[in-house]
A protein has these predicted regions:
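Amphipathic alpha-helical interface elements
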Residues: 1-86, 101-112, 119-126, 158-179
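Short, glycine/alanine-rich amphipathic alpha-helical segment
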Residues: 66-99, 138-152
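Amphipathic, Lys/Arg-enriched alpha-helical patches that create a basic surface
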Residues: 131-179
């Protein structure tokens, strides 16, 4: 068995199918984390629109002091946005016009998968060349990482990005109308 972050058992590691499964898992891990990062950066812009407006200096300070990943994670940013939008009637109207319950579920799913890929155990079984992600979500769970599943996660993440970017565009336009 080969664990992505550390060597456990070399038996079968030289088999081409194991190596391919390992490379596929690394590639999908990187892409899921990358697309989640893009969503997080877009959320940063939406939160800046809401809290500090368009002035560059304020935005940069807000991002570096409040929205930095050391202070505020992706899930916390989502909760802040959800709470903030509900407190401002015209933004709430815009958000509800854009709101799609399925996309919100996909955002939560993206956050969960991003955290699992980033922090939990990705294992390639040397005997079967099957890659699994072992993670904790209330209890220990595992999911087989196939190309189909990984591409589905990535496609959902891209839809979430487009949705958040749409919120950013709508909020940015609404801010310009107020100025």
């Amino acid at each position: 068995m080969w664990r992505i972050n550390r060597f456990v058992d070399g038996n079968g590691l030289d088999q081409e199918s194991v190596r391919q499964s390992y490379e596929m898992a690394k590639s999908f891990r990187a892409e899921v984390i990358d697309v989640a990062t893009l969503v997080e950066l877009e959320l940063d812009d939406v939160l800046c629109d809401f809290f500090v407006g368009s002035e560059f200096g304020f935005r940069e300070r807000f991002k570096s002091h409040i929205l930095s990943t050391e202070v505020c994670g992706l899930f916390q940013k989502w909760k802040i946005l959800r709470s903030a939008v509900n407190t401002k009637s015209e933004w709430s109207t815009l958000a509800k016009a854009q709101k799609d319950t399925a996309l919100i579920k996909e955002l939560k799913s993206l956050i969960s998968f991003r955290n699992s890929f980033a922090h939990d155990e990705l294992v390639v079984d040397a005997k079967s060349a099957v890659c699994t992600l072992s993670y904790f979500e209330g209890e220990r769970k595992t999911i087989k990482i196939t190309k189909k599943i990984a591409l589905s996660i990535i496609d959902e993440a891209k839809l979430v990005f487009q949705w958040v970017a749409g919120l950013h565009y709508a909020f940015e336009g609404e801010m310009e109308q107020r100025n």
